[in-house]
């Protein structure tokens, strides 16, 4: 019979094992958004931008980041050599002006990320064609060719989501990326129909009259976005079945007041009602491969409590990986509700890893991690991401394990062991062995 001492030791071992598993999960998405709309790259020049990105990627690698979501299409312009759209002003300062000396940031980033064992997801903004800060559109901007496909909303120019030809256009842009670049994912964020502004209404009367087919206008707008998400998903997987399609929606689906059955106990803007984004439907139908809701508030927020929302999303994760979008600035700016001498990172990470359906997180934004605000990067490096993690499994994309490598040998060098092997033969591009160590 097991004595009390042995039982106590066993319980202690099991507890330590469980804690270690929580701190070092085998599979976990550890992403970071690298955005261009904060003007961090504008006018830097080729060499300086490459130095900046190299430093950021090196630091993010030390912090255990295994996926980069790189913004390449902010407003119908491109940080890559697009076949459809002009070079971005966020790169050169003037929309339509190529970088000099010439280079392709997306191609360069893919190579740099893969060399560090990171995935690269090309992040595009599907409908936003011009923001307030853009004063002039290039002659090759799509609005110059087809102004009838767009509407103005305040100082924003939006491609009308209600027109079928607009869905086709965006899918053509994405197909161009897929055919020419070795991206691991296509990512879109929270900009669908525009965020509501006081005194403004969406000017889509003509489009609704033509395509509404008797539907309630709100339902029709949601269906427009649904059709786009489904078409983009099908487009991506038809061209490259292994490329992941992910979305990072606003952090509130619906408030309890609007939907007593599926709403969260919050009081804020809503995906479903205000942005016409039915995120739960996309997950249920399998139209997205992962979901990263932007839960950017703090624990204890009066209208959108982080604790409440992260639990809600975990309960509604469905059958697709759920990652949590984390706001680094807000996390380190807000005190822990129990210990005011600490910020909220520790409590947020503990909560995230304690919930059964959350398989990782994505940091908004990469530079805040690199700048180590509130020792955020240090804590990732030394504690939460101390050991590397594989990406979460997606069996609907690929459920077959790769074949074993052949003729594996080792060689000792002053930098440690080097491994050499012959890769297994693959029958298709999807099954070829590309391994980064």
Name the predicted role of every residue range.
Residues 279, 287-300, 320-394:
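Substrate-binding cleft of secreted/luminal carbohydrate-active enzymes
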Residues 78-92, 128-153, 191-212, 258-268:
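Aromatic- and acidic-residue-enriched segments that line the glycan-binding/catalytic groove
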Residues 51-77:
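Catalytic domains of carbohydrate-active enzymes, especially glycoside hydrolases
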Residues 382-428:
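Pro/Thr/Ser/Gly-rich low-complexity, intrinsically disordered linker/stalk tracts
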Residues 247-266, 309, 313-345:
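Active-site clefts of carbohydrate-active enzymes
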Residues 173, 180, 185, 192-264, ...:
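Active-site neighborhood of glycoside hydrolase catalytic domains
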Residues 35, 39-44, 127-176, 180, ...:
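Active-site-adjacent "subsite" loops/lids of carbohydrate-active enzymes
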Residues 435-437:
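Conserved small/polar residues in nucleotide/adenosyl-binding loops
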